[in-house]
Swiss-Prot record:
Transmembrane segments: none annotated. Its EC number is 3.5.3.23. Residues 23-43 are annotated as: Disordered. GO terms for biological process: arginine catabolic process to glutamate; arginine catabolic process to succinate. Catalyzes the hydrolysis of N(2)-succinylarginine into N(2)-succinylornithine, ammonia and CO(2). The active site is at E174, H250, C371 (nucleophile). GO terms for molecular function: N-succinylarginine dihydrolase activity. The gene is astB. Belongs to the succinylarginine dihydrolase family. It comes from Pseudomonas putida (strain ATCC 47054 / DSM 6125 / CFBP 8728 / NCIMB 11950 / KT2440). This is N-succinylarginine dihydrolase.
Length: 449
């Protein structure tokens, strides 16, 4: 039976704005309070989805969240009608309103961790929604994320869904942004690679000094247990605390893996040789031939990697076995990074081509191509069991473009978030979207009695 890696990209929501909410994310902080263009952001994301689908890659869509999150504001003590809640929050606590309007769910690499059926004890695809406990604006996402994933992957014969881990710092979980899977073929048993920033319960592990380590070892271990993964198919690695302090807030900002290949920066991990040795040995035991592509700091400094998002790229396998690297425009604009990519594709390794996309609206908030997608490895029968309304086609692309143009503003500043009409616009758009994507009632406003 054939198997595929399907990329489900987050559709940018109507409240996309530059709130500067993500401490430790350099781009998010440096573009704080600029005016955003939600319509352009959504169109840029859709263009990438359509281009990859046209190239023969399996592509799906993950719906955005209801924003502003009025229920979250009510839990913080704001009362009255929905409009009154928004206006009172704007007057009394603007940072809370900004957080409740965040469109950060577009970065679906943080939506969940996914283990394919070939790796799990019960032979089903397992999903654990990420609690995103480190940042308030993201910690409110997982209930809706779970409902959306449940509506997309709704056949219990093939799919198992787990609630987010306990919402405390000790189990801080950032989802697939700190998880990669290596395999010979997508449908065969592989090795799941969990990267953490610190240990919650063992003080012997080093930790960053400036920025928070968002993922704990204990969270990664809990997800592996929930998914029924065997020890011979799991490797844990600690991310280098020094690069977290340089703005590498998730591992997908300093490495990317696919198939048998890990593309990583020289400074990405602690005890790199031991980590690579484990990956090589465990993948070999499953018939695979692990290949590591190390980018030396002499060629690309960590600062350049963070600024260009070289590693927040998509490493995709073509039918002929070669690989394509999907990078943001910022890589072409960085002389050193672009020179390195020229060498990479000409030196005879697995990466044969680099494809550049303009994702500026997302990039200015600190999210590149890899942030925007959740990878799900599926066998043919499993893919057939996915809700087909979320699979990208030419028709769906056209429908979503028209939907965006109807409902999205082309400019959004902080003052606009206080406009109660924005909530009405968002709910109207999402109500229509659930019909387009055949999701049912996944949003809180659709579920109110």
């Amino acid at each position: 039976m054939k198997s595929y890696e399907v990329n489900f990209d987050g559709l940018v929501g109507p409240t996309h704005n530059y709130g500067g909410l993500s401490y430790g994310n350099v781009a998010s902080q440096s573009n704080s309070q600029q005016a955003s263009n939600p319509r352009e952001a959504a169109r840029q994301g859709l263009a990438k989805m359509k281009a990859l689908a046209d190239m023969g890659f399996k592509q799906g869509v993950l719906a955005p969240q209801e924003r502003p999150d009025v229920a979250a504001l009510r839990r913080l003590g704001f009362s009255g009608s929905d409009a009154e809640v928004i206006q009172r929050a704007a007057r009394e606590a603007m940072p809370l309103l900004v957080a409740s309007c965040s469109a950060s769910s577009m970065w679906v690499a943080n939506a969940a961790t996914v283990s394919p059926s070939a790796d799990t004890a019960d032979g089903r695809v397992h999903f654990t929604a990420a609690n995103l406990n480190c940042k308030y604006h993201r910690s409110i996402e997982h209930p809706t994320t779970s409902r959306v994933l449940g509506a997309m992957f709704n056949d219990e014969k093939y799919f198992a869904h787990h609630a987010a881990l306990p919402a405390v710092a000790q189990f801080g979980d950032e989802g697939a942004a700190n998880h990669t899977r290596f395999c010979r073929a997508y449908g065969e048993a592989g090795v799941e690679f969990f990267v953490y920033g610190r240990s919650a319960f063992d003080s012997r592990y080093p930790a960053p000094q400036k920025y928070p380590a968002r993922q704990t070892l204990e969270a990664s271990q809990a997800v592996a247990r929930l998914h029924g993964l065997s020890d011979d198919g799991v490797v844990y690695a600690q991310q280098n605390p020094a690069v977290i302090d340089q703005g590498v807030f998730h591992n997908d900002v300093i490495s990317v893996g696919n198939g048998e290949v890990l593309f990583y920066h020289e400074d990405a991990f602690l005890e790199t040789d031991a980590v690579l040795g484990q990956l090589r040995a465990k993948l070999a035991s499953k018939g695979g031939n692990f290949q590591a592509i190390c980018v030396p700091r002499a060629a690309v400094a960590v600062e350049d990697a963070v600024r260009s998002y070289l590693f927040n790229s998509q490493l995709l396998s073509r039918e002929d076995g070669s690989m394509l690297l999907v990078v943001p425009e910022e890589c072409r604009n960085n002389e050193r990074v672009w020179a390195y990519l020229g060498q990479l594709t000409s030196q005879g390794g697995p990466v044969k081509e680099v494809k550049v996309f303009d994702l500026k609206q997302s990039m200015q908030n600190g999210g590149g191509p890899a942030c925007l997608r959740l990878r799900v490895a599926l066998k043919e029968a499993e893919l057939a069991a996915v809700n087909q309304g979320v699979i990208m086609t030419a028709t769906l692309y056209d429908t979503l473009l028209q939907w965006v143009d109807r409902h999205y503003r082309d400019r959004l500043g902080e003052a606009d978030l206080a406009d109660p009409q924005l909530l009405v616009e968002c709910r109207t758009a999402l109500d229509e979207l659930t019909q387009i994507l055949k999701l049912g009632s996944v949003y809180p406003f659709q579920r109110q009695p």
